[in-house]
């Protein structure tokens, strides 16, 4: 627990830094020529794409007014350089640190409601030529389509589906150059993680239980994105015995039977505070006293301050890397994680971060 207390004491100090090229008196040596990358295919309109619900969506011209009713697609739009085209955004946007840091103008956009309660009137009044919604808003998407408003449905519940979402939005909005860069970054990091964990035996892969933000007795089934974070990082998801694509309630007996080696507590969905319970609450719960993770003090809380890294947002790759360090610190250090976090945010969101370990 001391190791992770140190990691969880990371001082998340955000530093807005302009990058300047270094100059010198001596001419720089001529580097070897780099291979010329394949050019990104040109997007032409009218354009027809197939969204993640299998529906064909046609756009007569490049979208200039985008509404995102889902924080996951909103974060993706920022990473793809589309924030200036957004004219409507999901509820409670002011609570999301990433918007304040990377695209503060989004906070003042019209509120179009949430994934659970979408405000159709507010969306239509924003006069969008493209709307992006979560899969659970199928009926709303149908209504908007019947009104002549192009609407994409997305469902990023795995690394592969997240890449599919980047490609879908990138293609539809003519931002494939940035989408390709993001996908290549993801794939490079996932390849590196696979290389680091390839020699782990089954016995070296801990059983990991991830709780929800509202209750320790809610966890992620095998089809949820959170499960993929665990397995990719060299662990075994305790919730793989459950079916479904949403947080699932269990009872004490099931939790005790799972007997995880590690327990992970995510930040809240706005990444501004801890969930409704803490690691200490779990460690001090007498009912859980015989659980391996509790006996060994292996109950860890994800960092707070930017985004919920256990969610399928672009920065979800940092959730995988954080999980890798948590489960296998001998393979991937806190210093490596800090460097990767800074690289990610500076590359795709335009600001630097410093994650300095407190003493």
Which ranges hold each PLM region?
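Bacterial N-terminal signal peptides that target proteins for export
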Residues: 1-11
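Bacterial lipoprotein signal-peptidase II cleavage site
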Residues: 19-33
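Extracytoplasmic substrate-binding proteins
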Residues: 46-49, 56-58, 140-218, 239-241, ...
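Structural recognition of the beta-strand scaffold that forms the well-ordered cores
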Residues: 65-69, 85-90, 111, 130-134, ...
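A short, structured surface patch at a secondary-structure boundary
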Residues: 68-126, 130-136
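Proline-aspartate-enriched helix->loop->beta-strand connector
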Residues: 112-115, 120-133, 149, 251-268
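Flexible, glycine-rich surface segments
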Residues: 220-290
């Amino acid at each position: 627990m001391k190791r992770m207390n140190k990691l969880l004491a990371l001082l998340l100090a955000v530093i807005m830094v302009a990058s300047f090229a270094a100059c010198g008196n001596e001419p720089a040596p001529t580097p070897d020529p780099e291979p010329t990358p394949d050019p990104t295919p040109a997007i032409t309109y009218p354009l027809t794409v197939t969204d993640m619900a299998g529906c064909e969506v046609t756009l007569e011209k490049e979208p200039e007014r985008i509404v995102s009713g889902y924080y996951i697609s909103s974060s993706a739009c920022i990473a793809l350089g589309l924030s200036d085209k957004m004219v409507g955004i999901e509820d409670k946007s002011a609570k999301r640190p990433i918007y304040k840091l990377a695209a503060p103008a989004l906070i003042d956009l019209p509120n179009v409601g949430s994934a659970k309660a979408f405000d159709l009137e507010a969306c239509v009044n924003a006069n969008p030529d493209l709307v992006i919604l979560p899969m659970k808003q199928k009926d709303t998407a149908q209504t908007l389509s019947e009104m002549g408003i192009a609407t994409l449905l997305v469902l990023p519940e795995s690394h592969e589906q997240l890449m599919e979402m980047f490609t879908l939005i990138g293609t539809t909005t003519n931002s494939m150059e940035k989408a390709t860069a993001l996908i290549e970054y993801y794939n490079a990091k996932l390849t590196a993680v696979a290389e680091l964990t390839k020699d782990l035996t089954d016995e070296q892969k801990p059983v990991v239980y991830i709780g929800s933000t509202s209750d320790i007795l809610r966890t992620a089934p095998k089809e949820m994105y959170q499960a993929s974070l665990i397995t990719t990082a060299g662990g075994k998801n305790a919730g793989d015995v459950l079916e479904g694509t949403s947080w699932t309630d269990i009872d004490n007996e099931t939790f005790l039977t799972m007997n995880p080696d590690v327990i992970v507590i995510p930040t809240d969905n706005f990444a501004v505070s801890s969930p409704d319970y803490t690691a200490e609450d779990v460690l001090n719960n007498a009912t859980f006293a015989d659980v391996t993770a509790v006996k060994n003090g292996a109950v860890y809380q994800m960092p707070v301050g930017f985004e919920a890294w256990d969610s399928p947002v672009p920065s979800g790759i940092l959730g995988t890397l954080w999980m890798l360090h948590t489960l296998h610190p001998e393979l991937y250090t806190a210093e490596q994680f800090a460097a990767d976090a800074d690289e990610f945010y500076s590359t795709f969101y335009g600001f630097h971060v410093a994650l300095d370990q407190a003493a």
